[in-house]
Amino acid sequence: MPKRTLEDTELNPRDNYIKVSSKKSRKEKREKKSKDAEEPATDSTPIDIEVESKEARRERKRLKKAKRAQEAEEEQLPEGNAIESTSDADAAACIKAAKKAEKARLKALKKEGKEEKVDIPESTDSATPISVAPQQNGTTYTEDYNLSGLPQSEIDSFLTTNFITITDPLSASAALRPLIKFDYLPITDSAQRAPFKDFKAPTPIQAAAWPFLLAGRDVIGVAETGSGKTMAFAVPCVRYMSSLPKNQKNKGPRAVVVSPTRELAMQSYEQIVKLAKASGLECVCVYGGVPKDEQIRALKTADIVVATPGRLNDLINQGCADLSKARYVVLDEADRMLDKGFEEEIRKIINTTPSLGKRQTLMFTATWPESVRELASTFMTSPVKIAIGDNPTGDLRANSRIVQKVEVVEPRDKEYRLMQLLKQYQSGSQKDDRILVFCLYKKEATRVEGFIRQKGFRVAGIHGDLSQEQRTRSLEAFKSGNTPVLVATDVAARGLDIPAVKLVINCTFPLTVEDYVHRIGRTGRAGKDGLAITLFTEHDKAQSGALINVLKAANQPVPDELLKFGTTVKKKAHDAYGAFFKNVDTTKKATKITFD
């Protein structure tokens, strides 16, 4: 094929004219079509006409596309669902029939033992929607369907009857209902439900706290001694641990419970173990007075740690206890631990756990003083405060089910009067009734124990001079009833759950009225009535004013002999630092002062 030359490729004037003319004709045709579709304004320029024609084409394409989509949708619809063939009355009837069929299906599933959570539209006020709590700490709580169906009046009656006050800073969770029956607990394992078989219903603190704890919220529980606080935090703890993957179990503490005394730590441990074993969880109790080696070995595989603040802090400092993965932290009897001067140890322990927002922190206390409030504001995130009883402020108040009797006697007559009381309440059908006798000092407890034993009574003792093995043996003998009389110092006055204590005798009044309230709290537990008799002497007159206030607050009689000592209430003295103690934040550093 011959090559084309430049002359061949160049257009002559005629060819160029034909090409331009053809372009103009095509442009005129497009303009004519656009005029037929939409007549442009008389003053429009050629450029405006071209733009308008493009917009018209786009609009026509859009309308055609919408029409095709509508036709395709109408072809897919069945005749019964055609809008043109269904009147308003027919539509309402269809919706009603669908609701009825859905209810019947759910009822059949329930009979077969299946469970399905669905949202059914309801127009009546009888049904309450299932509320789901906010998620925190990786846990989720869904309210039981039967609990949601209860009328609100029944829930309000339960809260009012049991004097339950719930303060939630997050209004979104205020609708969580108390678990007034064990059936409403989200626990399907029969082994985990076994500890509740001897109880009719949860205690008020358990019923009110469980939904918030199961939802992963931080909770402050203010309730009197013997109200079931241990199981209140134990059940959510075990459920949280059970929800963890298997590869995260038995590889170090994921939950920690801090208690003020060895006895209380052991008591909490015994309750938690009952639930933990059913879920294959390891639990260890860490306290002082025994060798550390066995505790250190157990900590390596323990899932739940129950400990006293002193021993746990020692193990942390030695690098033997790692709480960096403990996302469930419980401070039991927080007010008592602060009174004993454990605030610094508590702060160090919590600082070794995950940060705020990554852990769930619980605080249970019998009172709500300023020191406990400051601690809660430091280590808790939007906590829900649950107060049980007619004392929502958490001020010091004795159990209203305990009958309090105060006898003013001469100091030299105390032992004689003590023997009269033991003979009165340890005779006949009351021979095996448990009586708890409190003394102020360890030497006094040893002397009173020997005096009672010489008079022929079965008695045991528990105080700081005894070894841990001796204290445990005495406590077990008293719980079993083999030794019906127990002489103790204030080491046993707080938190110990000793069932069926009929009588508490204060042979010597304690140093503070707070200790008095916790002493007598060993009786009248678990909803039962109790009796407390106090031998008051002139040596105790400094506490007369505070004692009178406690008696009046509980509607108990105040003897005239006690009123003679006066009603003045002295400033509370700190257990460790005396009356001139100043409560300061020990975590803050001092300001450096320079002199010119």
Curated annotation (Swiss-Prot):
This is ATP-dependent RNA helicase dbp3. It catalyses: ATP + H2O = ADP + phosphate + H(+). Its main location: nucleus. Its EC number is 3.6.4.13. The keyword Nuclease does not apply. Residues 123-139 have a biased composition (Polar residues). SUPFAM superfamilies: P-loop containing nucleoside triphosphate hydrolases (SSF52540). The keyword RNA-binding applies. Residues 417-566 form the Helicase C-terminal domain. Residues 1-17 have a biased composition (Basic and acidic residues).
